[in-house]
Amino acid sequence: MAAKAYGYSGVAMLRITMIIASRAASVHSYHRPPARNSVFLSVPQDSDPSSPQQVHISLVGNDKMRISWITDDLVQSTVEYGTTAGFKPGTSATGNYSTYEYATYLSGYIYDVIIGPLQPSTTYFYRCGGSSQEYNFKTPPPQFPIKFAVVGDLGQTEWTQSTLDHISKSNYDMLILLGDLSYADFDQPKWDSFGRLVEPLASQRPWMVTQGNHEVEKMPIVHKTPFTAYNARWKMPYAESGSGSNLYYSFQVAGVHVIMLGSYTDFSSGSDQYQWLQADLKKVDRKQTPWLFVIIHAPWYNSNTAHQGEKESVDMKASMEDLIFGAHADIVFAGHVHAYERFTRVYKDQANNCGPLYINIGDGGNREGLASKYKYPQPSISEYREASFGHGELEVVNSTHAQWSWHRNDDDEAVVWDQVWVQSLAANTGCSA
């Protein structure tokens, strides 16, 4: 099916339409590679128990970065950093550490240190907990263009590794993960394995994540508190955005405002999350911040047969769709369904030029496999759908236009299979923001 080039016309639209139309026509002849094995990365037996592992970073405000890591033995909760490799100890920051218990499992020491202020578009080198091991990351740009890698339902299989390899070859500035991270599903050492698996990427670019159903991990009698591992291991800048929960927050970068919502915490009208969303949307000045993206886990629009009628989708949509539409959000990303689907701009199940695009991309590589069955006929609001593993890239070129592309893990190569230009609703004179 040909994709629309939202906001572009002429040669650009013709080129994109022809590319997508030709590829869509070839989908039926595509022979999908077989499923991949699960991956479990353990710590080498001869490793130093004080060495940092599972290192990952995330944005905090406009000019700070949270550094998180884990050790088996307790070390100092400090990070040394500078702008040259092999730097001498100088600038440093101190933070906190914690542990958590889950049934018979006791986590390692989890460290949380915020460093900054930092300069934009700058490479920093850093060391964790007094270790000599050096890492590096690059801060996002202060303005457009900026590129986001977008992935959902990642898991830890050989398909996951393929997805990560493809992302690593992209010149992206930060990654957004739409929930369902480790697929530990109560088996806590799998959280450690996941942290080791993603460290090569997550230690070099900020990863901003939200939770999915696989992060709940609530068990009657044995463990009654939900999201224990997720909240301990993946701290996000919720307090900085006025949220009272790590399960929903927002951040702003280079003229883009991103709202990360929680599909598995109370979203009803009058709930803390609902009231926070109302307040957060009111703070967004679309003249200063022309782009608005919303992240959920359970999709509000979905023509796959998987996960139909779930309350996390149906009830959350009923509660919050009016808020999102009224704020003129540009794109709503979701995961959960293990396939890819892109909708046109939608509001209340109908095409609407002032509604957000809806994109489902829960195809990162999880162990449960793909959701390959779709409802027929294909709804008119669904513009492209395919059950294949992959990831997305969103390059916000300027204040008015962005390019979205979906990269399929086709025969172990990252293939661009769906691509569309998007115009910011803030730049659409027919939609008053």
Q: What are the residue ranges of the model-derived segments?
A:
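An acidic-aromatic substrate-binding cleft motif
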Residues: 132-185
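Acidic, histidine-bearing metal-coordination/catalytic regions of metal-dependent phosphoesterases
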Residues: 2-150, 169, 387-388, 393-433
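Short alpha-helix in the alpha/beta-hydrolase fold that links the catalytic acid
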Residues: 163, 337-346
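Active-site neighborhood of phospho(di)ester-bond hydrolases with catalytic His/Asp-centered motifs
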Residues: 150-152, 174-180, 206-213, 262, ...
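Solvent-exposed loop/turn segments at secondary-structure junctions
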Residues: 74, 154-157, 181-184, 213-217, ...
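Short, solvent-exposed loop/turn elements at domain surfaces
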Residues: 65-67, 76-78, 87-89, 157-160, ...
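Extended active-site neighborhood of metal-dependent phosphoesterases/phosphodiesterases
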Residues: 109-114, 120-140, 189-292, 307-314, ...
